Curated annotation (Swiss-Prot):
Gene3D superfamilies: MFS general substrate transporter like domains
Lineage per the UniProt record: Eukaryota, Viridiplantae, Streptophyta, Embryophyta, Tracheophyta
Protein name in UniProt: Probable anion transporter 4, chloroplastic
Superkingdom in the source lineage: Eukaryota
Keywords from the UniProt entry: Chloroplast, Membrane, Plastid, Transit peptide, Transmembrane, Transmembrane helix
Task performed by this protein: Inorganic phosphate and probable anion transporter.
Species this chain originates from: Arabidopsis thaliana (Mouse-ear cress)
CDD domains recorded: MFS_SLC17A9_like
Chloroplast found in the keyword field: yes
Membrane-spanning parts: 117-137, 152-172, 179-199, 203-223, 243-263, 267-287, 342-362, 376-396, 417-437, 438-458, 474-494, 502-522
Length: 533
């Protein structure tokens, strides 16, 4: 069915209920296919009939949502709406499937509000992690801890992080991201808030508090992955992940930059109290303003909901809450090489991430002999770069897919940049003689690392959408084991060789090997997990 909007000299409605005037707008309403808002009618088109078919591009305008036509000075009596039964062409159908909302529509949509809240949660997640990376310097000095023992204290977070991702991913797949994320933020904020009292009680209480932070934060990324898969169509998921992970990296910046300031004002435990309370403020907004899926969101517009469903070609499984209590098919998941591609990539990502996050303040303090505030600043700059490049990578990834690049090739391009780039940059870091140069190399490494989020991280949703939560949990568990080895191993490695350089070179080589493995075995297509390899 095609609908024509003409500018006439008199009122002439074939379908009188199809056009309603509201202020300076004419709105097509009656039994129309979903059409997109036309922001204006150019002067040259005011005397030209515009045929509006769903998704069809006419005069470089795309129509997908409820149509609202600004009158732009056109007299109301010169508007006419008529309809015909013209058959839609394949080209029109294809155009409908590729029509994209403009930037203002995208940025004000409910799905972007949801991903913005996810970004804030991930920012708090990393801020609560990184506090100990700064606090460990004065703690180790005041209590006489060696570098190897400092590594063990920092790894206590990872021991907790090790046990929760698979269980958390399974819970996310069953109950949805809203509920599980709420519990996660509540628990890790409480544990962070109580850390000062735990530290004053005993070493074991401190280790237990940090382990509890790790347990609770293990659900954060599976929740993000699950909600992005439900709220965003494939052509927007890269940008959504880019926004969420930008918050993730900005949490590092906020934690590293604010912690020394808060320590100078409120003592060594000041940041733990402030960041812990911030989590509870976030929780109030999250519970009142979000839903696990778009079809359960009370404020989403009909046009946005239809757009999401149409672009996703949503299945029954994606539309309804997964209520089965069955055990996920771990054997079948592990029988496929694409699963191992994302597991290996996530393991290397976690190794590099936690080594840099945990050891860079100590690295700058001990190698370049800068004070704590300067060490925190040099360590924070790279994460600012990662937040910026992450969104650029997401935009570029979506653009490649919209222009016809296969999802598989797009993921491999992003992953290659995200691992080969840091590998080369870390080799450069070993040659730096000044802290400013070292921070520049580190910024390049961490900035390029963000491209891998548009490789392996989003790839989880594509190869196993029905198991994305549990698969992400499996990857995080493997990654946490790698992070424990890297974080603890770095301390022993430095004590054994007396230098950070050898460990940085080892990390660079592992990045390059992981990129090769991913390019050989990864795919962007859905994998059949109903049969074993």
């Amino acid at each position: 069915m095609c609908y024509s909007l003409s500018i006439q000299s008199s009122i002439d409605f074939h379908n009188r209920n199809a056009l309603k005037i509201h202020g300076d707008r004419a709105i097509l309403t009656s039994n129309l296919p979903t059409l997109r808002r036309i922001p204006f009618l150019p002067e040259r088109d005011r005397r030209r009939k515009l045929v509006l078919c769903t998704g069809r591009v006419v005069n470089s305008l795309k129509f997908t949502g409820n149509t609202s036509v600004d009158l732009c000075g056109i007299p109301r009596h010169r508007l006419r709406v008529s309809c015909s039964d013209a058959r839609r062409t394949p080209e029109e159908t294809a155009a409908e499937l590729t029509a994209q909302p403009n930037f203002s529509e995208f940025i004000t949509s409910e799905r972007v509000k949801v991903v913005a809240m996810l970004a804030l949660a991930l920012a708090l997640c990393n801020a609560d992690r990184v506090v100990m990376s700064v606090a460990i310097v004065p703690l180790s000095l005041s209590r006489g801890w060696s570098k190897s023992f400092s590594g063990i204290v920092q790894s206590s977070f990872l021991w907790g992080y090790l046990i929760s991702p698979i269980a958390g991913g399974t819970l996310v797949d069953r109950y949805g991201g809203k509920v599980v994320m709420a519990w996660g933020v509540a628990l890790w904020s409480l544990a962070t808030f109580l850390t000062p009292w735990a530290a004053d009680s005993s070493l074991w209480a401190l280790l237990a508090a940090r382990a509890m932070v790790g347990v609770a934060e293990g659900v954060a990324l599976p929740c993000m992955n699950n909600m992005v898969a439900r709220w965003f169509p494939p052509t927007e998921r890269s940008r959504a992940v880019g926004i969420a992970m930008a918050g993730f990296q900005l949490g590092n910046v906020v934690g590293l930059m604010l912690s020394p300031i808060l320590m100078s004002q409120g003592g060594i435990y000041g940041p733990f109290v402030i960041f812990g309370l911030s989590g509870f403020l976030w929780l109030l907004v999250w519970l009142s303003a979000t839903s696990s899926a778009p079809d359960r969101h009370p404020q989403i517009t009909k046009s946005e909901l239809e757009y999401i469903k149409q672009k996703k070609q949503i299945s029954t499984m994606e539309n309804k809450r997964i209520s089965t209590s069955g055990i996920p098919p771990f054997g079948r998941l592990l029988s496929k090489m694409p699963t191992w591609a994302v597991i290996v990539a996530n393991s290397m990502h976690s190794w590099g991430f936690f080594v840099i996050l945990s050891w860079m303040p100590i690295y700058f303090n001990s190698v370049y002999h800068v004070n704590l505030k300067q060490a925190a600043w040099f360590s924070a700059v790279p994460w600012s770069m990662m937040a910026f490049t992450g969104y650029i990578a997401g935009f570029w990834s979506d653009l490649l897919i919209r222009r016809g690049t296969s999802i598989t090739l797009t993921r491999k391009i992003m992953q290659s940049i995200g691992f080969i780039g840091p590998g080369i940059a870390l080799i450069g870091l070993t040659t730096a003689k000044q802290p400013l140069v070292a921070s520049a190399w580190l910024s390049l490494a961490v900035g390029l690392k963000s491209f891998s989020h548009l490789g392996f991280l989003i790839n989880l949703q594509e190869i196993a959408p029905e198991y994305s939560g549990v698969l992400h949990g499996m990857c995080l568990t493997a990654g946490t084991l790698a992070a424990i080895v890297g974080t603890v191993g770095a301390g022993f490695f430095v004590e054994l060789l007396g230098s950070f350089q050898g460990f940085i070179l080892l990390t660079a080589i592992l990045y390059l090997l992981s990129a090769l493995f991913y390019n050989i075995y990864a795919t962007g297509e859905r994998v059949d997990f109903d049969t074993t390899a």
